[in-house]
Amino acid sequence: MKAGATSMWASCCGLLNEVMGTGAVRGQQSGFAGATGPFRFTPNPEFSTYPPAATEGPNIVCKACGLSFSVFRKKHVCCDCKKDFCSVCSVLQENLRRCSTCHLLQETAFQRPQLMRLKVKDLRQYLILRNIPTDTCREKEDLVDLVLCHHGLGSEDDMDTSSLNSSRSQTSSFFTRSFFSNYTAPSATMSSFQGELMDGDQTSRSGVPAQVQSEITSANTEDDDDDDDEDDDDEEENAEDQNPGLSKERVRASLSDLSSLDDVEGMSVRQLKEILARNFVNYSGCCEKWELVEKVNRLYKENEENQKSYGERLQLQDEEDDSLCRICMDAVIDCVLLECGHMVTCTKCGKRMSECPICRQYVVRAVHVFKS
C-alpha cells in the first residue's frame, strides 16, 4: 500500500512540475509534510479561489421613472434642466428634447395664473431638478415665486442676446435712415443740383452718371409715397372719429325694436334672420325676403296676442285672489266675523279664530253667508 501511494504521489508531482514549475510543487510538498493527512493542503491567505469582483460603474437611470436605460429606453438629456431621461419620460418638440416636467412648465409660458393651476408636486419637481431647495416653501405661492425668480435668473442670458440683437438692429436702422435722409430730406438741394446741371455745358450734362439720376428720382417717388400714406392714415382716423360706433360691436336686432308691422318692411335680411333666430324660429327654407317678412309679421302678431292674454290672466288672478281666504288662501270667503263684521276668512278658518286678523277684536261668532 505504501509503495502504491508513493508511486501515485510521484506521478502527481511530475504532472504539477510540468504545469506549474518545480518551485510551486516544492512549496506544496512542504505543506504536505506539516499536514496530518497525505492529501491535505495548508491554506494560503494570499490566494483566493474566487475571482475578484468586477468594479461596477455608476448605474445611470432615468430621473423620472428610475429605470435603467436600454435599447427600448434610450437616454436623452433635457435641454432645460440638463438631466438624463428616457425616451418615455421626455418630449420632443421643435427638435428640442425636454422632460415632462420642464415641458409642462414651458407650456404655461411662466405666467403666474397658469403656474397656480399646476400641481404642487410638479412645481417641486421642477425646482428639485435644478438643485433648488424647497424646504422653506410652505405654500403653493412660495413655489411659484421661486420658479419665477429662478426663471428670471436663467433668462438673463437670453435677455442679453436679445438686447444685443435689438441694439444691432437699432444701429442698422439708424445708418439706413441717415443714408436715405441724405437723399430724401434735402429735396431743395437736389433740385438746385439739377438746375446747375441744366445750366452747365453740354459736356457737364453728359458727364452726370445715370446712377445719381436714378437715385434722385427714386428719392422723390419715396417722398410722394410717404405723403400718400400719411394722407390715408389721416382719412381713416377722421372716419373713426366721425363714426365711433363702427369700431364697437354691432347690436343685434330684437323683436322689441319693432313698434308696428310697418317697421318690418324696412329691415334688412340680416336683421330679420337675427330676430327669428333670437325667438327660436326656423328660417332654413326661406329663399326670399318676403318669406322672412311674413314669418316676422306672424311672430310679431303672436307676441302681441300673448302679451294681451297674459295681462288678462294677471287681472283675473288678482280678482280671484281678492275672493280667497286670507288665512288658508284656498277656500272662498264665505264667513262674517261678529261683532266687527269683517269678511276675510272662510267658515272653517273663521270658527278657529279667537280675534279678527284685521282689527284684533274678540270674535263672538262666525256666521256663514251665501252669495246671491
UniProtKB/Swiss-Prot annotation:
InterPro entries: CARP1_2_FYVE, CARP1_FYVE, RING-FYVE_E3_ubiquitin-ligase, RNF34L-like_HeH, SAP_dom_sf, Znf_FYVE_PHD, Znf_RING, Znf_RING/FYVE/PHD. It comes from Pongo abelii. GO terms for cellular component: cytoplasm; cytosol; endomembrane system; nuclear speck; nucleus; plasma membrane. A zinc finger (RING-type) spans 325-360. Interacts with CASP8 and CASP10. Interacts with p53/TP53; involved in p53/TP53 ubiquitination. Interacts (via RING-type zinc finger) with MDM2; the interaction stabilizes MDM2. Interacts (via RING-type zinc finger) with PPARGC1A. Interacts with NOD1. PROSITE patterns: ZF_RING_2. Residues 194-252 are annotated as: Disordered. The record marks D231, D232 as: Cleavage. This is E3 ubiquitin-protein ligase RNF34. Pathway: Protein modification; protein ubiquitination. It comes from the Eukaryota. A zinc finger (FYVE-type) spans 56-107.
